[in-house]
Amino acid sequence: MGASGVQMATRFVTTYECDADEAYKQSYIDAKKEDIVIVQSPVGMPGRAILNPFMKRAKEGQIPHGKCHLCISTCKPEQTPYCITEALVNAVKGRVDKALLFCGANAYRAVKLEHVRDIMEEFRPVEG
């Protein structure tokens, strides 16, 4: 009896085909196991992210609030440590030191850029 499918996302961030900014991809490659942490997002849900300078400042309450975009009804700007919209836009634009870098538990296992076809080849059954 074997698996009929798997769900993966993190593994494909560090592929040539992924349209994420190169600095975002490099953050995964540079991450160590202890850099992957559970964070509380401004919307009240926990998430897994890379502990970068932004997240360190957020934990210390050192990120000033700008204008609220009213993008998420559950967000309470007066109680949140940072604006999730700005943090995610920074990630998209490659400003990784000012970004929330969501990731999976095994993001630290990415060691290089590779092609999707090579990752998929790893899952092909071994003949014989």
Model-derived regions, located:
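Conserved active-site-proximal phosphate/metal-binding subdomains
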Residues: 1-128
